[in-house]
């Protein structure tokens, strides 16, 4: 393991060890590259997958998911506030602080996938700059949806990172990432995005491919709530209240219904950790994950050794 990656891997392994639960890039930014890649490069028309609770052909899911996020792009923060009762902001801060970007003497290259609005990327750069004095670490924001990327690009103009060379927005499919070379990334992050992908094992395979040896994969995603009475209360809120809020916030109840259903269909933390391990990663700590807010969300971390 390189001298750069070893401290990061050790930090994450030590930082997550024993934690079961808690109360809870380089082109100029002015040119947002829309380099599109699609899973439709291969014929999947004979295979079915889930879109929320519905079964749909695999080659249709990508289009359906794109429509959802195009619909909610301008209200994305409000959507996350509704789905997490506002706690997603704290979760994201925890997520980034666990990674501690910029903690190396060598600038890092970080890939944030499904991060079109820039929310995680800006937090990463703020942490690297303000906590670690690192003004050279860069983030590539990759998202399949140009509407989400447009939101991120617009927001970047209000940050110190606009036109700085430290952040880049590109349109990429998480299952392909053909613009990202092998063994080129120090950290790979994905927040509230992987459950919307058609083939999660392919996403994990690509994450493993692009990471350097010693590189870190970290995923923040909704998970399974516990104990059972709280889980049922949260489920009732999700299925009865959230679609109504979707109508009020974005004039779109159907997109919110899908997002709730996608959470319900996503594997529990232990199962997802096994998927990460099966992709070749070494799980950080005892379990490879940390649950937040009684399991509403979880942080999963793996290391490419």
UniProtKB/Swiss-Prot annotation:
The keyword Secreted is annotated on this UniProt entry: no
The domain of life for this entry's organism is Eukaryota
Alphabetically sorted, this entry's keywords are: Membrane, Methyltransferase, Mitochondrion, Mitochondrion inner membrane, S-adenosyl-L-methionine, Transferase, Transit peptide, Ubiquinone biosynthesis
- Compartmental location: Mitochondrion inner membrane
GO MF term set: 2-methoxy-6-polyprenyl-1,4-benzoquinol methyltransferase activity
Keyword Transferase included in the entry's annotation: yes
**One Pfam family per UniProt:** Ubie_methyltran
The GO annotation for biological process reads: methylation; ubiquinone biosynthetic process
Q: In which pathway does it act?
A: Cofactor biosynthesis; ubiquinone biosynthesis
Q: Which InterPro entries match?
A: SAM-dependent_MTases_sf, UbiE/COQ5_MeTrFase, UbiE/COQ5_MeTrFase_CS
- Give the EC number(s) listed in the UniProt record: 2.1.1.201
What topology does the record note for this protein and the membrane? Peripheral membrane protein
Q: Which reaction equation describes what this protein catalyses? A: 2-methoxy-6-(all-trans-decaprenyl)benzene-1,4-diol + S-adenosyl-L-methionine = 5-methoxy-2-methyl-3-(all-trans-decaprenyl)benzene-1,4-diol + S-adenosyl-L-homocysteine + H(+)
Q: Which GO terms describe its cellular component?
A: extrinsic component of mitochondrial inner membrane; mitochondrion
Residues binding S-adenosyl-L-methionine:
117, 143, 173-174
PANTHER family given in the database record: 2-METHOXY-6-POLYPRENYL-1,4-BENZOQUINOL METHYLASE, MITOCHONDRIAL, METHYLTRANSFERASE
* NCBIfam families named in the record: MenG_MenH_UbiE
Question: What biological function has been recorded for the protein in this entry?
Answer: Methyltransferase required for the conversion of 2-decaprenyl-6-methoxy-1,4-benzoquinol (DDMQH2) to 2-decaprenyl-3-methyl-6-methoxy-1,4-benzoquinol (DMQH2).
Family per UniProt? Belongs to the class I-like SAM-binding methyltransferase superfamily. MenG/UbiE family.
Q: How does it assemble?
A: Component of a multi-subunit COQ enzyme complex, composed of at least COQ3, COQ4, COQ5, COQ6, COQ7 and COQ9.
**What is the name of this protein?**
2-methoxy-6-polyprenyl-1,4-benzoquinol methylase, mitochondrial
The species this protein was found in: Schizosaccharomyces pombe (strain 972 / ATCC 24843)
Q: Please name the taxonomic classification of the source.
A: Eukaryota, Fungi, Dikarya, Ascomycota, Taphrinomycotina
């Amino acid at each position: 393991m390189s001298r750069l990656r070893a401290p990061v891997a050790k930090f994450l392994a030590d930082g997550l060890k024993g934690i079961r639960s808690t109360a809870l890039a380089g082109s100029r930014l002015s040119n947002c590259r829309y380099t599109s890649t699609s899973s439709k490069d291969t014929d999947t028309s004979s295979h079915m997958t889930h879109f929320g609770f519905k079964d749909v052909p695999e080659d249709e899911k990508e289009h359906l998911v794109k429509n959802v996020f195009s619909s909610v792009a301008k209200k994305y923060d409000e959507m996350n506030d509704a789905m997490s009762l506002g706690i997603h902001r704290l979760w994201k801060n925890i997520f980034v602080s666990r990674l501690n970007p910029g903690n190396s003497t060598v600038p890092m290259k970080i890939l944030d996938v499904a991060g079109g609005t820039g929310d995680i990327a800006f937090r990463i750069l703020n942490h690297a700059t303000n906590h670690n004095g690192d003004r050279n670490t860069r983030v590539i924001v990759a998202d399949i949806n140009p509407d989400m990327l447009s939101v991120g690009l617009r927001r970047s103009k209000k940050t110190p990172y606009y036109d700085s060379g430290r952040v880049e927005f590109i349109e990429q499919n998480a299952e392909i990432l053909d613009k990202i070379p092998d063994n080129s990334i120090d950290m790979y992050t994905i927040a509230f995005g992987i459950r919307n992908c058609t083939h999660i094992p392919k996403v994990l395979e690509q994450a493993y491919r692009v990471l350097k040896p010693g590189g870190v994969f970290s995923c923040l995603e909704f998970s399974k709530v516990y104990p059972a009475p709280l889980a049922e209360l949260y489920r009732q809120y999700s299925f009865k209240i959230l679609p109504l809020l979707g109508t009020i916030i974005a004039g779109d109840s159907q997109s919110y219904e899908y997002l709730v259903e996608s959470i319900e269909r996503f594997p529990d933390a232990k199962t997802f950790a096994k998927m990460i391990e099966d992709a070749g990663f070494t799980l950080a700590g005892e379990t490879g994950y940390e649950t937040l807010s009684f399991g509403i969300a979880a942080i999963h971390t793996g290391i490419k050794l």
